[in-house]
Structure formats: C-alpha cells, structure tokens
Swiss-Prot record:
5-amino-6-(D-ribitylamino)uracil binds at F22, A56, W57, E58, A80, V81, I82, L113. It catalyses: (2S)-2-hydroxy-3-oxobutyl phosphate + 5-amino-6-(D-ribitylamino)uracil = 6,7-dimethyl-8-(1-D-ribityl)lumazine + phosphate + 2 H2O + H(+). InterPro entries: LS, LS/RS, LS/RS_sf. (2S)-2-hydroxy-3-oxobutyl phosphate binds at D85, T86, R127. Keywords: Riboflavin biosynthesis, Transferase. This is 6,7-dimethyl-8-ribityllumazine synthase.
Length: 164
C-alpha cells in the first residue's frame, strides 16, 4: 500500500485569492491571512493576485474566470455569509460552495474554501484572525498542500481527461 500526503510548499506557485467585499470587516482579514500564509510558505508576493468581488455570490464566476486564464496553480476563495432572518443565507452559502467546487472539478485545479458561514458577526470575527484562527490562512495552506500532494502522487499526465 502506498500512502501520500502533501506539505504546504509555495515555491514557484502562482495563486489567486478571490475575496468578497461584503462583510469587509471580516473578509479583509481573511484575504490578508491568506496572502500572509502563502508568502510564509514561499509563494513570491508577485505571484499572488487578489481579486475583489462584491459579495460571496460572485466568488464562483470570478474563480472560474481566473482559472480559465491558466495563470494560476490554485485559487483560494474567501468571504463571509452571516445568517439573517430570511432563507437568503442558505441559498448564498450553498450555491457559492457548489459553484466553487464545480470550478475546481471543471478546471482540475484546487479551489479551497475560506468562506465563513456563521450565525453571527462575532462568530465570523473569531474565525477571521480571532480566537478560532484565520480560515483564510487555513484555506491558503490547504491549497498549497493539495498542490504538493498532486506533485508527489498524482501528476497530471498520469490520467486522462476522464480521470482514469
């Protein structure tokens, strides 16, 4: 049996961070955490692009457009959807996550989820550099780890377009 895992190594990588402006008191620290984590693991600052979109709903289309350029090894999506009094939260959170997953699958590129879905602003702040860490940084490290895993165990030329 072979067992593989990756390490968050950033040397030579080009990463796009796509961030939602809505709830910017939370999303700015998430984006900053992602960039800081990437640089801390060796991604050159000039190899990181940050794209700001109006809200979480726009994250998937911006990620898709970025990946279609073939300039990036991975995408890190960060945003914050905070529950309100209407079902809007469920629609935005679920469909945004689905759209990001589909972009990852369609482009065969890691797209990591730094999208907070919380009941309160305080819960979001706790996950954007507060007592629960920075989920933007966590998502950035996950992207690098998956890229390294792919390099070690799953090179792109080892399977055809159908994943076989």
């Amino acid at each position: 049996m072979a067992e593989f895992s990756g390490e968050p190594r950033g040397e030579g990588r080009r990463i796009v961070v796509v961030a939602s402006r809505f709830n910017e008191g939370v999303t700015v620290p998430l984006a900053e955490g992602a960039v800081s984590a990437l640089v801390g693991k060796g991604v050159a600052f000039d190899n990181i692009d940050v794209l700001w979109v109006p809200g979480a709903w726009e994250l998937p289309v911006a990620v898709r457009r970025a990946l279609s350029s073939e300039r990036y090894d991975a995408a890190v999506a960060v945003g914050a959807v905070i529950r309100g009094d209407t079902p809007h939260f469920d629609i935005v959170a679920g469909e945004t996550a689905r759209g990001l997953m589909e972009a990852s699958r369609d482009f065969d590129v890691p797209v990591t989820l730094g999208l907070l879905t919380t009941d309160t602003l305080e819960q979001a702040e706790a996950r954007a550099g507060g007592v629960h860490g920075n989920k933007g940084a966590d998502a950035a490290l996950a992207a690098l780890e998956v890229l390294d895993l792919f390099d070690r165990a799953l090179p792109a030329n080892d399977y055809d377009e159908d994943g076989e």
